[in-house]
């Protein structure tokens, strides 16, 4: 089956040409990397990245940092996108094992072999369309991936409503096991925003503590900081699972490419959402 886009026309333009223009606006924005990426068609050398998932007018320039570095690091066969479940619907950890997701830029095929093996390997994961039908956190990553890679990749969506350490480790380890079994050149994307609806300075301070743990590849420490400082980061589980996966794939460090808040775009610093672009590199 083909999943229809849930947030086209809201989070990003529904018209293909307008969407391409907006993605290019994100890359060239003063908060973005400044120029368009040149995609490397060799195997991807990055094991994973972190990208935000708000409306493109707010978080798109930050996301563009992630996708520029990713594109220039090579072209993966399979992209596993881990996003939080905002709707509360469906299984607590859900993938889809067949079909495609449509965006204004075309359809992206699910890597059915990978997703099916993942459900078999990971005891907490179900094959469940309901969790994905109206969720935006994974969908908004696809147009960026389509812009830089065209139709050269397949993907696996993983929507998470569970954010505990044990679940994150189970999911992250299963992703790596399947990638190795299938010999897939795989990149893992954690889709997350950081602090929600707090003053800019307060959001920055909280988010800096969390990002320090992410770039140190410390999934347990990240969860502990989120809990201790009551950080309203939505993608805790997806980010923790991504850290687990990239460490097993040989990552030695994470690098913060860009941090900004919605206030940096809108000029309203009273109630902001934090966004970060992070890449994980092998040693």
Swiss-Prot record:
InterPro entries: MEMO1_fam. Pfam families: Memo (PF01875). NCBIfam families: AmmeMemoSam_B, PRK00782.1. Belongs to the MEMO1 family. This is MEMO1 family protein MK0963. It comes from Methanopyrus kandleri (strain AV19 / DSM 6324 / JCM 9639 / NBRC 100938).
């Amino acid at each position: 089956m083909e999943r229809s886009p849930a947030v086209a026309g809201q989070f990003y333009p529904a018209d293909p040409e307008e969407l391409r223009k907006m993605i290019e606006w994100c890359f060239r924005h003063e908060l973005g990397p400044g120029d368009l990426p040149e995609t490397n068609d060799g195997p991807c050398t990055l094991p994973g990245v972190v990208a935000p998932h708000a409306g493109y007018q707010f978080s798109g320039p930050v996301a563009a940092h992630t996708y520029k570095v990713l594109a220039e690091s090579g072209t993966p066969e399979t992209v596993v996108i881990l996003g939080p479940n905002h709707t509360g619907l469906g299984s607590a950890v859900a993938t889809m094992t067949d079909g495609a997701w449509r965006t204004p830029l075309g359809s992206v095929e699910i890597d059915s072999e990978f997703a099916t093996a993942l459900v078999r390997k990971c005891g907490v994961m179900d094959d469940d369309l309901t969790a994905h039908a109206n969720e935006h956190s994974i969908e908004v990553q696809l147009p960026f991936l389509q812009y830089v890679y065209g139709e050269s990749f397949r993907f696996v969506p993983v929507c998470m409503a569970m954010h505990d350490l044990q679940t994150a480790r189970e999911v992250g380890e299963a992703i790596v096991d399947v990638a190795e079994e299938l010999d897939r050149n795989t990149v893992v994307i954690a889709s997350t925003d950081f602090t929600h609806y707090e003053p800019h300075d307060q959001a920055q301070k909280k988010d800096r503590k969390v990002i320090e743990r992410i770039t140190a590849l410390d999934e347990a420490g990240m969860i502990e900081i989120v809990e201790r400082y009551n950080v309203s980061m939505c993608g805790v589980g997806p980010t923790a699972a991504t850290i687990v996966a990239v460490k097993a794939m040989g990552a030695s460090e994470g690098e913060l490419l860009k941090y900004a808040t919605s206030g940096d775009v809108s000029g309203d610093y009273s109630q902001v959402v934090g966004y970060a672009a992070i890449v994980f590199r092998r040693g």
